């Protein structure tokens, strides 16, 4: 009996770090308080004892003081230039989505053999380093949920169909044709950087008409043939809590994506719909506990490790004076 990708990830993968360059990567733009998210993510990865660094793909409009905060938190700053798609005449779900096309630059980071991309509004509550050992040649991500009003322009939403629970509403083949391909949320991706892929992404994006969900739609189209779904535990989209609670066990969740309106911890708004739920407030509280934990600040963490594990501390110290303080040249391909 063939084991599914999901079961293979959870059951059979072993971690081997020797001679392999791996890293987490996130994306940062603008001069607002989004740096707080990256700090929270960096501290979350430390809390779960991840063995790998956090690279921050940073646009030129990120202030120097914000960059220094991230360096002080052990992040590796990687400067990138924006990627602009063709003009969108229909509009995006959110106006700021247009800048997210710049995330395509992470495929250029070929100094890493495998990377895990995480949006800034994500927190890691369990170690997911084992995902680096997924088979090469594929893009791994979690299936999205179509039940929120942000999907109102899609045929899935209009007929009440969601790929998270396809048994609830059968796709009407007679009237709408074949079911749509499985569609992933691009807030969390496991991928292998590759220059050929990178250059092709930049070429294809310039001849592809932008759509409602911007780079997420584009990535779904581009990687359709090599996409492999992984369990929702690796990217819990908030809407799953009230749309598909039968699929969710919070004790098993590794990664939480604070993407629902009002749910972002640094500007939590209990007045927004669903934000008065106790499970939401608990997850927001957990984010703040990590963010405010000074023992997870990079310097304090290294000092603690030096007492517990001198070898680990030596490696971390070398990183501090070597990799972390080095901001690589910007990409402008």
Curated annotation (Swiss-Prot):
Its EC number is 2.4.1.123. Gene3D superfamilies: Spore Coat Polysaccharide Biosynthesis Protein SpsA, Chain A. It is found in: Cytoplasm. One of its GO terms (cellular component) is cytoplasm. It catalyses: myo-inositol + UDP-alpha-D-galactose = alpha-D-galactosyl-(1->3)-1D-myo-inositol + UDP + H(+). GO terms for molecular function: inositol 3-alpha-galactosyltransferase activity; metal ion binding. Mn(2+) binds at residues 119, 121, 257. It is an enzyme of class 2 (transferase). The active site is at residue 103. Keywords: Carbohydrate metabolism, Cytoplasm, Galactose metabolism, Glycosyltransferase, Manganese, Metal-binding, Transferase. It comes from the Eukaryota. InterPro entries: Glyco_trans_8, GNT1/Glycosyltrans_8, Nucleotide-diphossugar_trans. This is Galactinol synthase 5.
């Amino acid at each position: 009996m063939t084991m599914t990708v999901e079961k293979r990830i959870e059951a059979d993968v072993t971690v081997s770090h020797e001679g392999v360059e791996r890293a987490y990567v996130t994306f940062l733009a603008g001069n607002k308080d989004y740096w707080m998210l990256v700090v929270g993510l960096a501290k979350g990865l430390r809390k779960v004892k991840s063995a790998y660094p956090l690279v921050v793909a940073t646009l030129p409009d990120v202030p120097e003081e914000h960059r220094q905060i991230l360096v002080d938190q052990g992040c590796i700053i990687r400067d990138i230039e924006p990627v602009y798609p063709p003009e969108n005449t229909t509009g995006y779900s959110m106006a700021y989505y247009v800048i997210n096309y710049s995330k395509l630059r992470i495929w250029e980071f070929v100094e890493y053999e495998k990377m895990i991309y995480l949006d800034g509004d994500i927190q890691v509550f369990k170690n997911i380093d084992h995902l680096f050992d997924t088979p090469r040649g594929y893009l791994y991500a979690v299936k999205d949920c179509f039940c929120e009003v942000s999907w109102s322009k899609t045929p899935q939403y209009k007929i009440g169909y969601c790929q998270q629970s396809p048994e609830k509403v059968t796709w009407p083949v007679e009237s709408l044709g074949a079911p749509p391909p499985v569609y992933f949320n691009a807030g969390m991706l496991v991928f292998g950087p590759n220059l050929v892929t990178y250059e092709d992404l930049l070429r294809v994006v310039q001849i592809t008409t932008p759509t409602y969900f911007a780079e997420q739609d584009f990535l779904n189209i581009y990687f359709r043939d090599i996409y492999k779904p992984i369990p929702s535990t690796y990217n819990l989209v908030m809407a799953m809590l009230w749309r598909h609670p039968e699929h969710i066990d919070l004790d098993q969740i590794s990664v939480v994506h604070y993407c629902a309106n009002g749910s972002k911890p640094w500007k939590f708004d209990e007045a927004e719909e669903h934000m008065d739920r106790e499970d939401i407030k608990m997850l927001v509280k957990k984010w703040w506990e990590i963010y405010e934990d000074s023992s997870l600040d990079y310097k304090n963490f290294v000092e603690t490790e030096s007492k517990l594990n001198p070898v680990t501390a030596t490696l971390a110290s070398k990183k501090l004076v070597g990799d972390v303080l080095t901001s690589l040249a910007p990409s402008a391909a």
